[in-house]
């Protein structure tokens, strides 16, 4: 494991514990021996107030590679969400999470989670990852929002 990645992730954890957005969760997982695994985080993103996502708490796994922060983490909703920019596997499709697009090593875990929360209510229809959600979002917004509200209710804490 890269010393640079672990050092940066330890800093991220410290910063998060000191100050993070209300309702969000970001915690490194534990290894079988009880030690902390800074390369694998369990996160949760609350649905934004005043949106169909409100009331839901959406669980997300953040996996870091040894070359972090040169490369972005993989962010995956568990279980996968109904959303135009979430692949059927649960992986989030967002430009700041793509090395060849908008990823920069200075981007923090907090910024990633806030960016994903923003994406939930404001899908990028130029970059769809899930055909069904994309089609319903484009063709029947009322039905789309109904499904999102049902999903938020299902994942309420």
Swiss-Prot record:
Keyword annotations from UniProtKB, A to Z: ATP-binding, Cell cycle, Cell division, Chromosome partition, Developmental protein, Mitosis, Nucleotide-binding, Nucleus, Transferase, Ubl conjugation pathway
Name of the protein described by the UniProt record: SUMO-conjugating enzyme UBC9-B
EC numbers for this chain: 2.3.2.-
UniProt-listed Pfam families: UQ_con
Organism (species): Danio rerio
Root EC class: transferase
Phylogenetic lineage: Eukaryota, Metazoa, Chordata, Craniata, Vertebrata
Active-site residues annotated for this sequence: 93 (glycyl thioester intermediate)
Superkingdom classification of source: Eukaryota
Domain spans labelled UBC core: 4-157
Sites marked Interaction with RANBP2: 4, 25, 57
């Amino acid at each position: 494991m890269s010393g640079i990645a672990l050092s940066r992730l330890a800093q991220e954890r410290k910063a998060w514990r000191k100050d993070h957005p209300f309702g969000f969760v970001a915690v490194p997982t534990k290894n079988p021996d009880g030690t902390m695994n800074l390369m694998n985080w369990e996160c949760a993103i609350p649905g934004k107030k005043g949106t169909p996502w409100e009331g839901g708490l959406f669980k997300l796994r953040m996996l870091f590679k040894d070359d972090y922060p040169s490369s972005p983490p993989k962010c995956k909703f568990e279980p996968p969400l109904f959303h135009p920019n979430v692949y059927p596997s649960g992986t989030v499709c967002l430009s700041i999470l793509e090395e060849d697009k908008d990823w920069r090593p200075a981007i923090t875990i907090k910024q990633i989670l806030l960016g994903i929360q923003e994406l939930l209510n404001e899908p990028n229809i130029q970059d769809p990852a899930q055909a069904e959600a994309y089609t319903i979002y484009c063709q029947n917004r009322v039905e789309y929002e109904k499904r999102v509200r049902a999903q938020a209710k299902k994942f309420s804490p």
